[in-house]
């Protein structure tokens, strides 16, 4: 019996679909600890057993939101099972994504360095920029 060939980029497509569906399902949750949540990315294991769902929060405490989302993971997985056309629906693990915070911190550091450089250039009379 011939084995089926692997579908190229299937894991990425499944992760993208999970991201879209989970984002829609989170809006239906009634838990007040879940504020304005944005699903940033989803990483699915090769066997589709587990999925890390990275999220950011505009309003609310990230730790409380993560706890609430992880408590609702069973409900979300069950709802995904009804929506997705795959044999194995992964167990969802929610993690707060700090990428936005890090980007803001780096942006502030770059701005500070540029301001310091401009101030140093102004302090040196007769200095020209290269």
From Swiss-Prot:
GO MF entry, a single one: ribosomal small subunit binding
Cellular-component GO terms for this entry: cytosol
Gene name in the database record: rbfA
Natural source organism: Methylibium petroleiphilum (strain ATCC BAA-1232 / LMG 22953 / PM1)
Origin organism lineage: Bacteria, Pseudomonadati, Pseudomonadota, Betaproteobacteria, Burkholderiales
Function: One of several proteins that assist in the late maturation steps of the functional core of the 30S ribosomal subunit. Associates with free 30S ribosomal subunits (but not with 30S subunits that are part of 70S ribosomes or polysomes). Required for efficient processing of 16S rRNA. May interact with the 5'-terminal helix region of 16S rRNA.
Cytoplasm among keywords: yes
Full protein name: Ribosome-binding factor A
Domain of life: Bacteria
Major location category of this protein: cytoplasm
UniProt cross-references to InterPro entries, sorted A to Z: KH_dom-like_a/b, RbfA, RbfA_dom_sf
Subunit field text: Monomer. Binds 30S ribosomal subunits, but not 50S ribosomal subunits or 70S ribosomes.
Similarity section: Belongs to the RbfA family.
Keywords for the protein's UniProt record, in alphabetical order: Cytoplasm, Ribosome biogenesis
Subcellular location(s) of the protein: Cytoplasm
Annotated SUPFAM superfamilies: Ribosome-binding factor A, RbfA
One biological process term in Gene Ontology: maturation of SSU-rRNA
């Amino acid at each position: 019996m011939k084995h089926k060939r692997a579908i190229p980029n299937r894991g990425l497509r499944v992760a993208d679909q999970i991201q879209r569906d989970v984002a829609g399902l989170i809006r239906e949750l009634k838990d007040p600890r879940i504020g304005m949540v944005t699903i940033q990315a989803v990483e699915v294991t090769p066997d589709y057993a587990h999925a890390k769902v990275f999220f950011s929060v505009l309003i609310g405490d990230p730790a409380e939101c993560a706890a609430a989302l992880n408590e609702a993971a069973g409900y979300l997985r069950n709802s995904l099972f009804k929506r997705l056309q795959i044999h194995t629906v992964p167990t969802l693990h929610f993690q707060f994504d700090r990428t936005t915070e890090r980007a803001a911190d780096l942006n502030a550091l770059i701005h500070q360095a540029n301001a310091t450089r401009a101030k140093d250039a102004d302090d040196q009379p007769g200095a020209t920029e290269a």
